[in-house]
């Protein structure tokens, strides 16, 4: 295709040109050109290779690729500019203008290319050496370290925290006030604010066991599971629609959400929780609870055949997405980086990626009916005539145009509305041997470029290298995967699990990259503590509630968020990784909405069941869906349920939730952002939800306090921020009320930092 890079131009490359090549040119060649123009390409197109200096100089079939110093005569530049018939990369979007400018500059500098000789394949992994990396080492249970200030220690983990602080000349902050502490622990464990009565009872209780009793009560609350589940649903990219252009609804996906809530409330051991999600159908095919757990596999975005007509390719995309999320959620590894080539940073060969994917090769979607065969037959008969008419209309609409097309589309909507509700199902999975995907290493991740065949096997860095592959026709491959993930010798699963719990309570994990424990991820701020907690999790039968309890009863957790030595500590530890004070945090989107509902008296605490579609701007819905795809409940009380029960659609997120950093649900979300920007203030001051609930709060305050403005202000502050108003706050509030603005006063409370933040 293209040819010739002048040897003289690259013989003595200047430093700037070489730097430009290495930083700007070579990465683009590797990402955009090597697929067709390198030694590893399935077929070298145009006879041109660009993966070495010598190969580039030799050129291809159509002449010189580069004329050093003259971009106008360089065919490579013409090709990436898409001039004439030469277009590179072929059948892909044109390179960005800035990238093309880099190539032009490189040619003007004489096209310096420091590569010498033939490209050499990377050396095989030295797994023995790779296992020396901290994350792949066995979990070590060390005794808690000795500390100077023994009086500060309430729990063993305090010794690890205090030892780190003392080693750096720091001290922990004083204890938090009881008012701050109850608000903190209530939001952390239930996602809801404490009532004024609960706050007063706790602050007036002088018993040394008062806080312990509070923690135990909250851990036993059914709202504990709702709060804990939200964090997990982020990790597993929970949504009830498939995204892309159709955003197809996955009926009854909410059963997975309820399964997770119940699992956390029941304190289901984490190894069992993991196993049921990976292989619940293999454990008990007809058990609704186990099948609900396997909805985990169905939660990812899916491009259906209309957007991807090649069924085998679509299947590959689904398996890829599931493999990636298993690696992120349970192993804390970016295994997806080994899909197209060996992982650049972690000891994960491409072959290992497809071996991991092979555990899923026989997994097929399967909707478990929750009605009898007789009931199903009646439903089918009721739907038969409507479905036949729909088939006729859909054939007709393909040929129609203009007004006729609109008329038929309306008829389709009318017929769809007549369909009886579908049978209750669980959108789970099962193994189908005859539909098992033959697994191969895919060269560059391309479905058509199949390399050597592979069968299921764990990641090599985490097992004995002599371990053979599992037979491809193993009847329960995912059970074997779950068994490996939860083996006592497997170091990542317990570390990743306890790190997520730590993050829930302190805002930042001991490893602050919870989905990446690899070389590109963060190193643990307190590795001994991480391992001690991981071993404690396994010793306690993988139960999570004892871990929560231990953290919450520690002095590390009960610190104030205002350290008197902050000015010194922040210079030594600017991110507060060693916990010299508690990290103040903004409430999540769900917590803000639920808190406004609770304070206003509108919160509906109904648990479980179908997800709720809350009112959203009709114009916004109309742009994305048919009216039937966003049907607001006729029961207005349903709109006031907790945020975890709102439907999670990929193509339309509730604007209030989006502005406060609710995740996009396209991939695993290991940690929420906590941004601060103008649209948040606009939402809280001018948004329909905040104003509606401010009105409800104003009415509640009048009902509870009557016309006594002093009492009303006191009650308002106790409800909203869990304390009485300061003198200045009281005076300002009374002035506001004298102006006859009770709703605006209530709205101002929602906008206080004391409402939006936990100390």
Label each PLM-derived region with a short phrase.
Residues 168, 697, 731-735:
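Recognition helices and adjacent regulatory flanks at domain boundaries
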Residues 61-67, 666-672, 737:
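Conserved phosphate-binding loops in nucleotide/dinucleotide-binding enzymes
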Residues 77-81, 156-165, 263-265, 273, ...:
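An acidic, gly/pro-interrupted, aromatic-rich
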Residues 170-175, 515-517, 721-725, 729-730:
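Short acidic, glycine/serine/threonine-rich helix-capping segments at coil-helix boundaries
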Residues 461-464, 728-737:
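Helix-loop-helix junctions that connect adjacent transmembrane helices in secondary transporters/permeases
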Residues 4-281, 343, 362-511, 519-555:
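Aromatic- and Gly/Pro-enriched helix-to-coil junctions and flexible linker segments
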């Amino acid at each position: 295709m293209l040819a010739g890079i002048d040897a003289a131009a690259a013989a003595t490359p200047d430093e700037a040109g070489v730097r430009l090549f290495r930083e700007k040119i070579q990465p683009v060649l590797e990402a955009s050109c090597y697929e067709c123009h390198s030694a590893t390409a399935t077929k070298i197109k145009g006879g041109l290779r660009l993966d070495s200096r010598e190969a580039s100089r030799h050129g291809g079939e159509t002449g010189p690729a580069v004329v050093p110093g003259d971009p106008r005569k360089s065919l490579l530049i013409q090709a990436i500019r898409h001039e004439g018939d030469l277009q590179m990369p072929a059948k892909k979007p044109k390179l960005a203008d800035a990238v093309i400018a880099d190539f032009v500059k490189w040619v003007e500098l004489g096209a310096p290319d420091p590569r010498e000789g033939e490209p050499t394949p990377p050396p095989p992994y030295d797994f023995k050496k790779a296992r020396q990396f901290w994350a792949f080492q066995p979990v070590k249970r060390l005794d808690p370290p000795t500390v100077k200030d023994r009086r500060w220690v309430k729990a063993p983990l305090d010794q690890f925290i205090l030892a780190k602080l003392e080693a750096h000349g720091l001290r922990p902050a004083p204890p938090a006030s009881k008012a701050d502490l109850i608000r903190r622990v209530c939001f952390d464990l239930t996602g809801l604010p404490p009532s004024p009565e609960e706050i007063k009872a706790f602050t007036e209780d002088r018993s040394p066991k008062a806080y312990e009793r509070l923690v135990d009560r909250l851990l036993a609350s059914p709202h504990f599971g709702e709060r804990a589940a939200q964090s997990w649903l982020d990790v597993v990219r929970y949504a009830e629609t498939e995204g892309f252009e159709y955003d197809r609804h996955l009926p009854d996906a909410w059963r997975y959400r309820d399964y997770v809530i119940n699992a956390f409330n029941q304190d289901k051991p984490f190894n069992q929780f993991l196993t049921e999600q990976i292989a619940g159908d293999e454990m008990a095919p007809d058990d609704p609870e186990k099948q609900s757990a396997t909805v985990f596999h169905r939660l990812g975005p899916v491009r259906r055949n209309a957007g991807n007509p090649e069924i085998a390719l679509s299947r590959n995309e689904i398996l890829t997405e599931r493999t990636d999320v298993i690696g992120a959620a349970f192993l804390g590894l970016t295994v997806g980086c080994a899909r197209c080539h060996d992982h650049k940073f972690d000891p994960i060969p491409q072959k290992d990626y497809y071996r991991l994917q092979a555990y899923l090769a026989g997994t097929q979607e399967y909707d478990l009916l929750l009605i009898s065969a007789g009931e199903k037959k009646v439903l089918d008969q009721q739907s038969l005539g409507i479905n036949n008419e729909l088939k006729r209309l859909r054939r007709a609409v393909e040929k129609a145009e203009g007004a006729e097309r609109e008329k038929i589309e309306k008829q389709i909507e009318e017929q769809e509305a007549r369909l009886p509700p579908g049978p209750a199902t669980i959108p789970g999975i099962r193994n189908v041997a005859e539909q098992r995907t033959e697994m191969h290493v895919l060269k560059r991740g391309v479905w058509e470029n199949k390399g050597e065949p592979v069968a299921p096997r764990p990641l090599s860095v985490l097992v004995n290298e002599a371990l053979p592959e599992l037979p491809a026709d193993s009847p329960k491959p995912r059970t074997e995967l779950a068994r490996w993930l939860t083996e006592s010798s497997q170091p990542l699963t317990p570390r990743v699990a306890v790190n997520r719990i730590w993050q829930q309570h302190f805002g930042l994990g001991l490893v602050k990259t919870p989905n990446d424990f690899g070389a590109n991820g963060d190193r643990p701020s307190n590795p001994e503590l991480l391992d001690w907690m991981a071993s404690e999790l396994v010793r306690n039968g993988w139960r999570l509630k004892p871990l929560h309890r231990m953290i919450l009863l520690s002095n590390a957790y009960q610190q104030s968020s205002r350290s008197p030595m902050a000015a010194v500590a922040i210079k030594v530890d600017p991110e507060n990784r060693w916990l010299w004070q508690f990290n103040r945090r903004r409430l999540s989107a769900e917590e803000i909405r639920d808190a406004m509902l609770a304070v206003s008296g509108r919160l509906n605490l109904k648990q479980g069941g179908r997800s709720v579609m809350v009112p959203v701007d009709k114009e916004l819905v109309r742009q994305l869906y048919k009216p039937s795809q966003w049907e607001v409940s006729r029961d207005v009380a349903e709109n006031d349920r907790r945020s975890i029960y709102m439907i999670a659609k990929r193509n339309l997120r509730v604007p209030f939730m989006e502005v406060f950093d609710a995740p996009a649900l396209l991939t695993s979300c290991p940690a929420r952002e906590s941004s601060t920007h103008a649209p948040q203030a606009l939402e809280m001051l001018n948004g329909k939800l905040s104003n509606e609930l401010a009105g409800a709060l104003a009415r509640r305050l009048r009902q509870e306090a009557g016309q006594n403005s002093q009492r009303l202000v006191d009650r308002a502050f106790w409800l909203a921020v869990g304390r009485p108003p300061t003198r200045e706050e009281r005076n300002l509030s009374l002035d506001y009320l004298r102006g006859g603005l009770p709703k605006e006063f209530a709205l101002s409370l929602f906008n206080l930092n004391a409402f939006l933040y936990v100390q």
